[in-house]
């Protein structure tokens, strides 16, 4: 739940058109972690001592997160209004910025009715399927990249761990650039679909080619699925006007998405060495799920925006003023980001 929880938290502080880059920076940390994680694991596995290498690895990778979690509990504010590092005027500005999109509304606490409303909102489910497809790859690729490289037949274990880093360095750059551009043009779907398509091409190369250079190039392409992950999380935060409804949508996203690793971590059995074609084709199919669902979500939101435009025209084109809390979303000047 930590992955979807951070974008939800960021949505409390930033307007919709600035959320992509912030979420992208957060997710890019996963790419950087994978860039050095394999080398770190290999180095620790060679350590000699009274404590088993796997125990040392758990300590080295787990203790910093646990300590920072304690620090975050006391230091991270619940909302702009409770940020102790801001004075009263700065808090008011931060709240105004986070609610700048017409239709976005601040609510007091979790509203169960709105959370349940997200279950009935058809726009909550395509992102969950996209997140599932991404997590099939997101969970399996970092685990098996060193093995895939070593099975190419031209590299030692040390070289394989070292060669695992460049694809993720490129991925880190791609996440940040794509998130920045997504904010600039105020679009999410095309970047999600584009990242998944590039990753699908990479998996096709890995499944069909035997040349070492081509397969290694395919890894660079396959890691671009991380771009889609970052912007799917952003898109969910952009699609709902209240914190409670966003929370419900993120719960749906996490529930569907976390089924992906169940499949992803079992698609590269040793019996499929050296090319792991079955796993590559399954991962390619998962990327295509993201492509199809991304296009479908764009269509649904485009259609919803047209409906909202017609409602606005019937009401005289007035997009100003506050609407009563009980009215539906068609009655508020809210427009979906495609």
Can you name each region flagged by the protein language model?
Residues 208-217:
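Helix-loop junctions at membrane interfaces in 12-TM secondary transporters
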Residues 113-180, 233, 264-265:
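Extracytoplasmic gate region of multi-pass secondary transporters
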Residues 243-275, 282, 286:
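A late C-terminal transmembrane helix in Major Facilitator Superfamily
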Residues 73-107, 246, 275-338:
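Intracellular terminal tails of multi-pass secondary transporters
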Residues 189-205, 228:
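Structural signature of the two symmetry-related core transmembrane helices
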Residues 40-49, 149-150, 181-183, 267-275:
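Interfacial helix-cap and linker-helix signal at transmembrane-aqueous boundaries
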Residues 1-14, 227-242, 250:
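Intracellular juxtamembrane helix-capping segments at the cytosolic ends
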Residues 18-53, 58-65, 250-264:
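Glycine-rich segments within core transmembrane alpha-helices of 12-TM secondary carriers
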